[in-house]
Amino acid sequence: MSKLSILKQKNKRDVDMTQGSIFRHLITFAFPLLIGNIFQQLYNTVDTWVVGNYVSNEAFSAVGTVGPVINMLIGIFLGLSSGAGVVISQYYGAKRYDKVRDTVHTSIVMTLILAVLFTIIGIAMIPFVLNFMKTPAEVMPESSAYLTIYFAGVIGLMLYNMGAGILRAVGDSKRPFYFLVVSAVLNIILDLVFVLSLGMGVEGVAYATIISQGVSAMLTMITLFRTDSCIKVELKYLKLDKEMLAKIVRVGIPAAIQMAITAFSNVFVQSYVNYFGADCMSGWTAYSKIDQLLFLPMQSLALASTTFVGQNLGIDQVVRAKKGARTAFIMSVVATVILTIPLLIFAPQLVSFFNGKAEVVAYGSMLLRYCSPFYVFCCVNQVYSGVLRGAGNSRAPMIIMLSSFVVFRQIYLFIMANFISNTIIPIALGYPAGWLVCSTLTLLYYRHADLSKSRLVEDAEKRAEASGKSRIKAV
């Protein structure tokens, strides 16, 4: 047997969440995620800041307009990678390391196939998508250029997210954080070089983004190839395992649809916002960037709860999984309330950081002050959707979000725009209205859900592990 085929079950960076302090596991897992996501938002924010201050208002609007499209793309693949992460975390918790290995290699092959498809289909769909969003003619060329470059380099985004999801599934959120920091710093440097020094405009920002994402993907893949644990990637195992692919799809497809639905609903909202012109679009872009920062704590804790619940249900510790869910929810509420207060007080100053034009600041600060008090409701659907996904049930969150963010929100927007008040504030309040409906439905479902029923690890496999039949040996 080759040296590389005899793998350690655990690496020192892996974390077993099936025992020990729940709060400590959640905070130590979520904190690197939070800081990493802040860095990711930082370089997205720098993109926007550079364009808004050193290119043109039209370029600023162009970058803002493509935001929902980019987020929809990211959402689709985050959903698929979360499917792989849930399968890995449950088998890791159940100590079925052979199944972990099979899932890891299936996930990588799936990612490479999807990257090719996303690139081809994405570039072909750009004109249709921008026209569907009612993108103004003056920003159409720059929006199209940005999206074309982004889709051409999407493989970096996809490989990083899948690789990071694999690492997080076994409790390692630190190394994905380190790679994001490197990517963020590189992106900022390239932004300044391409836009300020070389005058490449929106295209320079897009190139900076895909290059930095490519570097983070490379670092993640090198880590997976060089690790000595059960998530090690080896060329000879790179194939699609039908059983593992079916389980990834079972969790990942509904999760991908759920995340795409959220982003797609934003495409609808963006089309309503575009109606009010470039200043409103710019104000909305600034508001959206700040909005994304506020969501980071609850999103990080939602990811932490997914891994925590996955590992604990893998070994059938349902009570501990539910305690983790409750703890993550309380933590997210506290963090969100603390962050909301400065937004209400310093809204104009925050918006002016992105664009100092008076009309843009007025729109952006108004949107912040109307919407930010409702962010606390998002903690419910963010955390408990993460819990349900960790349990292997991503279908229920998908249906709930479809009902709330597509059906309800689009009916609300249509009625507001056509029959009640065709102004920006009633349109913007479609967000809090959707959050409230989604959170109510999610909480009602969770209170009556049996988490153990959606567990992906079969009892037979658990018995096999107890009998010592795992194919991968410990060193």
Where do the protein language model's features map onto the residues?
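Residue-level signal for short hydrophobic patches within transmembrane helices
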Residues: 19, 23-42, 46, 69-76, ...
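Small-residue hotspots at the loop-to-helix junctions and early N-terminal turns
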Residues: 55-68, 144-147, 206, 278-293, ...
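Short runs within selected transmembrane alpha-helices of multi-pass transporters and secretion channels
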Residues: 81, 150-168, 176-184, 205-220, ...
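Small-residue-rich hydrophobic transmembrane alpha-helices
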Residues: 60-120, 157-176, 270, 283-347, ...
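Helix-terminus/linker motif at the lipid-water interface of multi-pass membrane proteins
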Residues: 38, 42-60, 130-137, 193-200, ...
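Transmembrane helical elements of multi-pass membrane transporters/channels
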Residues: 28-47, 149, 160, 183, ...
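Short alpha-helical transmembrane segments in multi-pass integral membrane proteins
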Residues: 1-30, 88-155, 197-253, 309-374, ...
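Transmembrane alpha-helix boundary and packing residues in multipass membrane permease domains
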Residues: 33, 37, 49, 86, ...
